[in-house]
A protein has these predicted regions:
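Residues embedded in well-ordered secondary-structure elements
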Residues: 32, 92-94, 116
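Extended interaction regions within the primary functional domain
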Residues: 1, 19, 73-75, 84, ...
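Alpha-helical assembly-interface signal, strongest on the long, hydrophobic N-terminal helix that forms
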Residues: 2-65
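Surface-exposed beta-strand edges and their flanking turn/coil or helix-capping segments
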Residues: 19, 28, 67, 116-120, ...
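Short amphipathic secondary-structure patches
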Residues: 45, 49-104
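Low-complexity, S/T/G/P-rich flexible repeat/linker segments used as non-globular hinges
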Residues: 106-136
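Compositionally biased, intrinsically disordered low-complexity regions
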Residues: 14, 63, 100, 115-117, ...
Length: 136
């Protein structure tokens, strides 16, 4: 490195400039990967809370929606897709005891630090559980 900097030819300066630019690009990619991992961890937490609420209530009803809004105000804006293998009452989205319930939480974001380009990325996580409520 000392030889490159002490060399009076212009190619040494160009090599250093290209090296610094390459180092910055690696740093940007590393920070983006770290950000996506942290976002994924937050999504896992949110989906865990939501599936816990849904399975204990045995439905994707009013209490589930209230919990969604509470988590949106605490964390960030996210999309939720809730489904079940079989509904006991599809109007109220009730799921019978022992049936599988699934919650998918996703966030649409962009890769940052690449200049004028916007590269869209969707980060999502899925959790499932078994309904704990018996409907008569």
């Amino acid at each position: 490195m000392k030889k490159i900097l002490s060399n009076r030819k212009a190619e040494g300066y160009i090599d250093v400039a290209v090296g610094i630019i390459a180092l910055m690009m690696v740093l940007v990619v590393t920070l983006n990967i770290y950000t996506f991992f942290m976002l994924r961890q937050d999504l896992d937490t949110v989906s865990g809370f939501l599936i816990e609420t849904a399975t204990s209530e045995g439905s994707f009803g009013e209490e589930f929606d209230e919990r969604c809004e509470e988590l949106r105000s605490s964390f960030f804006e996210f999309d939720v897709v809730a489904s079940a293998d079989e509904y006991y009452n599809s109007t109220y989205e009730r799921v019978q005891l022992g049936d599988k319930m699934t919650v998918t939480v996703s966030v649409h974001t962009y890769v940052r630090g690449v200049g004028a380009f916007k590269i869209p990325v969707t980060v999502s996580t899925t959790r499932s559980g078994i309904s704990e409520k018996y409907w008569k």
